């Protein structure tokens, strides 16, 4: 799963530590998410998106991009 957490975090002039405080997690978790080492829970993804003031689908995407979701049945 690709993500743009670092991009939006830097645009908001937030450190990893500050974003972690606002989102309710650790700085290490934000770092691991940014590096793609950890896929956040839905709850954590929503918390991060809220603090960065972006839609969660703009923050996280499947490897093929948004078009890849077209084949998923709900």
Predicted features by range, described:
Residues 1-11:
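A short, Lys/Arg-rich alpha-helix, primarily the initiator
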Residues 35, 54, 64:
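Short, conserved catalytic or interaction motifs in soluble domains
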């Amino acid at each position: 799963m690709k993500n743009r957490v670092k991009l939006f975090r830097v645009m908001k002039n937030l450190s990893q530590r500050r974003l972690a405080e606002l989102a309710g997690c650790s700085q290490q978790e934000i770092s691991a998410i940014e590096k793609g080492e950890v896929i956040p829970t839905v709850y954590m993804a929503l918390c991060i998106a809220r603090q960065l003031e972006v839609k969660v689908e703009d923050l996280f995407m499947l490897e093929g991009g948004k078009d890849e979701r077209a084949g998923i049945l709900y």
